[in-house]
Amino acid sequence: MVLSAADKNNVKTTWDKIGGHAAEYVAEGLTRMFTSFPTTKTYFHHIDVSPGSGDIKAHGKKVADALTTAVGHLDDLPTALSTLSDVHAHKLRVDPVNFKFLNHCLLVTLAAHLGADFTPSIHASLDKFFASVSTVLTSKYR
């Protein structure tokens, strides 16, 4: 999915607004995903997926850091996320549908926290961004 100049600006501006809350919001999104789509817990049998757990917070930080890297490399996501793509394809073997679940839960979480700043334009741009990241992370599955 191609991000337009407006999408890139929306993503960068929104990520700047999120600032130091990225790990917290992503952890909340993960909790939403595990609650709404319990089959996603399959890939996390080795950690405590209960709401607010240290494991959820730690994984939220990992995902937030990866997304922050992606925001900084919007023009070359495949290179920026290459190692992470290898891990998801060859080691973790996460079913690609789970990325869609997480994307949805992240959008819901961001909408709740950003309020009026979560405009239809921001929503669309973030949706495209998360879909682009997911596409890169699943690109090496073949």
Swiss-Prot record:
Q: Which domain of life is it from?
A: Eukaryota
Pinpoint the Globin domain residues.
Answer: 2-142
Provide the GO biological process annotations.
hydrogen peroxide catabolic process
Task: Please give the residue positions where the record annotates the modification N6-acetyllysine.
Answer: K17
Q: Which residues carry this modification: N6-succinyllysine?
A: K8, K12, K17, K41
Residues found modified as Phosphotyrosine:
Y25
A Gene Ontology term for the protein's cellular component: hemoglobin complex
Q: What is the tissue specificity? A: Red blood cells.
Entry's family note: Belongs to the globin family.
Q: Which PANTHER family match?
A: HEMOGLOBIN FAMILY MEMBER, HEMOGLOBIN SUBUNIT ALPHA
Instruction: State how it assembles.
Output: Heterotetramer of two alpha chains and two beta chains.
Q: What is this protein called?
A: Hemoglobin subunit alpha
Q: Which organism is it from?
A: Cavia porcellus
